[in-house]
Amino acid sequence: MEVEEIYKHQEVKMQAPAFRDKKQGVSAKNQGAHDPDYENITLAFKNQDHAKGGHSRPTSQVPAQCRPPSDSTQVPCWLYRAILSLYILLALAFVLCIILSAFIMVKNAEMSKELLGFKRELWNVSNSVQACEERQKRGWDSVQQSITMVRSKIDRLETTLAGIKNIDTKVQKILEVLQKMPQSSPQ
């Protein structure tokens, strides 16, 4: 039940004993002081009279302090404060997340710039290494060609040397044959 319905229900309960008293002719002033139905009754009205154009009845102001709940359906005021505190903490956490997200985006932009710089430097180093490798390859190719040329010259020299040795042995044989022959005198 809502608060307004509870008060209307209590009002109906109060009207029944008063109606009985009027029928019996008993004064409500004399009877109401000792009747348990009339003890400690306070009514709270919403602004119904203002809507109807009537004058508002004086009602006792409810203090701003918490009072213990009289009904099990009424929520204690500390719960409202706790929920409000949780909402405030949630809002602060949300603001903190926004600030951290902005900080992360700024750092991400800075790191992107640094990474682009590193990429350019790596590209330059890669090009330099590639140029060095090409020069080294050309150098090795020229060394290989020189080695091949020297080997071919050595092979020619060896064949020439073998031919010279062969000629030398033949010349030696010819000399020996000539020395063994009698010397003819010229006449």
Swiss-Prot record:
Cytoplasmic-facing ranges: 1-85
Q: Which domain of life is it from?
A: Eukaryota
Transmembrane segment boundaries: 86-106
> Where in the sequence does glycosylation occur per the annotation?
N124
Q: Where is this chain primarily localised?
A: membrane
Which compartments does it reside in?
A: Membrane
Q: Gene Ontology cellular component?
A: plasma membrane; specific granule membrane; tertiary granule membrane
Protein name per its UniProtKB record: Mast cell-expressed membrane protein 1
From what organism does this protein derive? Homo sapiens (Human)
Q: Which gene encodes it?
A: MCEMP1
